[in-house]
């Protein structure tokens, strides 16, 4: 594998990476979500893991809402710490204050890489205020000096009833039709 050259169309070389159906689905999902692009994964945990690993580095902190899906909880609390990544949670039912307190607690533990939000939460349907999350994160700096990303898993509502990209111009995860979509903007 190599990077494509200028003015080169990479083509479809390996069906697990890309194929005509997958390409069409990703293009249509990007249009549906009003996003620049989209990526389709085989499972929700593949999308979540890929996104978190893209931003987590040893010594960084991921702040997350709670409760979250069990696989995500295991990744945040058992797997990522083995690689020097700390996770700090807050209950979505605690409102904006709980989120602000989690950010305050995280500040002394390392650079904040990401704010991971599952809203509505599964199985409690707890909601997180995405506009407040954006406001809180706007005053922070991640390990690279940039603002930490906000990652939203909106499995329960999808893009018809909830549009995270309209409120949070970072990443959105949506599981539907037994797949996950990560949409960068």
PLM regions: where:
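Conserved N-terminal alpha-helix of the aminotransferase class I/II PLP-enzyme fold
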Residues: 1-46, 71-79
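Conserved PLP-enzyme active-site core in the AAT-like
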Residues: 37-185
